[in-house]
Regions:
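A detector of tandem-repeat and repeat-rich interaction/domain scaffolds
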Residues: 1-2
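Catalytic machinery of carbohydrate-active enzymes
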Residues: 6-255
């Protein structure tokens, strides 16, 4: 039924996927009283660089969004973009990716004193976020007795396995193990986001052989810039998070 609201919503998303933004916006504007359509419209405006329109719409409807818990995650992300980290991390707790079904008998950590307790931290995000936010386990280590960090098998080799009071695990290696507390990596940030780290303060393993290899290939007298040009093809916000590698030809050919 073309008048069915889910059909109309899917039609708008289809137009966005096909980069037919004019027709998508027309549908979204017509149904912006529906919060689902409203969120997509605001997001689309931001992604198109129409920040003024996006911010006007967001600010006019923020009170409406606050009343609907289904969109707290979106509010959290927007607050984080705006630099309001306290509210941002508070609302981010309502994200859909938050793991709740692992080690069900283990208490969720919510800031209690754990200096003589063990705690396990679960990865829940993409590989990049797992690497980026893993440094906050260094803060957690300072206030706990033992920290275990569960990461995907495909990147376990990237982490230092000889850190004091931090164990790197996978879902397979924690079977039959018990912990006093658990927390997801995304939730850890609300406790430690103000902490500062030096560039070499992280959980990563330095592969000196690989470093030496690339130092020989690259001109060390010039700046070195890394470009992440593609996210997971099945990840959120695709195709907006990726660009064709060919489109970087001119940049990559610069001397």
């Amino acid at each position: 039924d073309s008048k069915y609201i889910e059909f109309i919503f899917n039609k708008a998303e289809y137009f966005i996927l096909k980069e037919n933004y004019i027709d998508a916006i027309e549908i979204l504007l017509e149904h912006k009283d529906n919060t689902k359509f409203l969120i997509i419209l605001i997001n689309l405006y931001f992604k198109m660089g129409r920040d003024h329109e996006a911010n006007l719409l967001l600010n006019d409807t923020r009170d409406k969004l606050i009343k609907d818990k289904n969109f707290y995650n979106y509010l959290g992300i927007r607050y984080l973009y705006e630099g309001n980290f306290e509210k941002g991390w508070e609302y981010y707790e309502f994200r859909g990716s938050k793991l709740t079904n692992i080690l069900k008998g283990t208490k969720l950590w919510n800031g209690e004193k754990i200096h003589n307790k063990s705690i396990v931290v679960f990865n829940e995000q993409g590989l990049g976020d797992t690497i980026q936010f893993s440094k906050y386990l260094l803060s957690l280590r300072k206030i706990s007795n033992e920290v275990s960090f569960v990461v995907p098998k495909k990147i376990i080799h990237l982490f230092n396995h000889n850190l004091d009071k931090i164990k790197i695990e996978t879902n397979d290696t924690i079977i039959n193990k018990t912990y006093d507390y658990k927390i997801t990596l995304g939730s850890l940030l609300k406790f430690f986001y103000k902490d500062k780290f030096k560039i070499n303060e992280n959980l990563l393993m330095r592969d000196q052989i690989n470093i030496n290899k690339w130092n020989k290939k690259l001109d060390i007298t010039k700046p070195k810039v890394g470009i992440v040009w593609s996210g997971s093809f099945l990840g959120p916000n695709e195709p907006f998070r990726s660009v064709p590698l060919k489109s970087l030809d001119k940049i990559l050919s610069l001397d």
